[in-house]
Amino acid sequence: MFPSPALTPTPFSVKDILNLEQQQRSLASGDLSARLEATLAPASCMLAAFKPEAYSGPEAAASGLAELRAEMGPAPSPPKCSPAFPAAPTFYPGAYGDPDPAKDPRADKKELCALQKAVELDKAETDGAERPRARRRRKPRVLFSQAQVYELERRFKQQRYLSAPERDQLASVLKLTSTQVKIWFQNRRYKCKRQRQDQTLELLGPPPPPARRIAVPVLVRDGKPCLGDPAAYAPAYGVGLNAYGYNAYPYPSYGGAACSPGYSCAAYPAAPPAAQPPAASANSNFVNFGVGDLNTVQSPGMPQGNSGVSTLHGIRAW
């Protein structure tokens, strides 16, 4: 008989399969511990940053890790093709400085706003203080003396435009600057131009209306009335009795006694009915007389002492 060949280990035997499972479990537990340490390190860093009294050092973290492993038990074996998880960076509590737990972020924001407002106010004040300084001050107006004005006017009548040397010479004579002489000549030429324009407008414009003359009669001269010829004023004061329907009859038609000196008149008989004579009759009894003749008409039977009484006996009252 042939000797039995030596038993060579095959990767597919029961022992190899069991050993492979154990190796995978050990690798998985190592990866899990690395991942837990990586996740717990940032947590402990944050805890130490905000609550430093709760942080008790690496011993507490190790005990918590052991308890977590015991509770979770063996982890499932990951596949062989899966890459290993990269280790997360470890944070140290003192790397970035410990913030003050008593300080409120709202207070920081308020302080920042207050600083910004103060800076803006300072900038506005500086701008307001600089603006008046930047404004250019106007130079005072130059006042020429009478002798200077007279000499400038005389030179302007001779020559309206001056060259630079002539300006300098005139300025030195009058004790002025060349710029002052130049500006004076410019203003004088502009003034002459405006005067010519005004004269042209006056010539082209319509002529003004002539003054109206009104004749006013002189009524009083040297304290005495100067009426002149009364005949000239008679037409203005003429009274036409025909327009008012008054019928004037001749005085002899009344057959009664005259008035007594005591202003008592006798009764006159009733006047005859008014007969309307023809308008074109030459013997018309209507009378037209002026106001100036009223005082001269007197009754023949009335005494002269009673001349102040009205003597219009020919006017019939309504």
UniProtKB/Swiss-Prot annotation:
Described function: Transcription factor required for the development of the heart and the spleen. During heart development, acts as a transcriptional activator of NPPA/ANF in cooperation with GATA4. May cooperate with TBX2 to negatively modulate expression of NPPA/ANF in the atrioventricular canal. Binds to the core DNA motif of NPPA promoter. Together with PBX1, required for spleen development through a mechanism that involves CDKN2B repression. Positively regulates transcription of genes such as COL3A1 and MMP2, resulting in increased pulmonary endothelial fibrosis in response to hypoxia.
Domain of life: Eukaryota
PROSITE patterns: HOMEOBOX_1, HOMEOBOX_2
Keywords: Developmental protein, DNA-binding, Homeobox, Nucleus
Pfam families named in the record: Homeodomain
A GO CC term assigned to this protein in UniProt: Nkx-2.5 complex
Gene Ontology molecular functions: chromatin binding; DNA binding; DNA-binding transcription activator activity, RNA polymerase II-specific; DNA-binding transcription factor activity; DNA-binding transcription factor activity, RNA polymerase II-specific; protein homodimerization activity; RNA polymerase II cis-regulatory region sequence-specific DNA binding; RNA polymerase II-specific DNA-binding transcription factor binding
Coiled coil: none
S-S bonds: none
Subunit comment: Homodimer (via the homeobox); binds DNA as homodimer. Interacts (via the homeobox) with TBX5 (via the T-box); this complex binds DNA. Interacts with HIPK1 and HIPK2, but not HIPK3. Interacts with the C-terminal zinc finger of GATA4 through its homeobox domain. Also interacts with JARID2 which represses its ability to activate transcription of ANF. Interacts with FBLIM1. Interacts with TBX18. Interacts with histone methyltransferase NSD2 (via HMG box). Interacts with NEDD9. Interacts with TBX1.
Chief site of localization: nucleus
Annotation: DNA-binding region: 137-196
GO BP terms: adult heart development; apoptotic process; apoptotic process involved in heart morphogenesis; atrial cardiac muscle cell development; atrial cardiac muscle tissue development; atrial septum morphogenesis; atrioventricular node cell development; atrioventricular node cell fate commitment
Protein name: Homeobox protein Nkx-2.5
Tissue: Predominantly in the adult and embryonic heart, and to a lesser extent in lingual muscle, spleen and stomach.
Record text about domains: The homeobox domain binds to double-stranded DNA.
SUPFAM superfamilies membership: Homeodomain-like (SSF46689)
Family: Belongs to the NK-2 homeobox family.
Compartments in which it is found: Nucleus
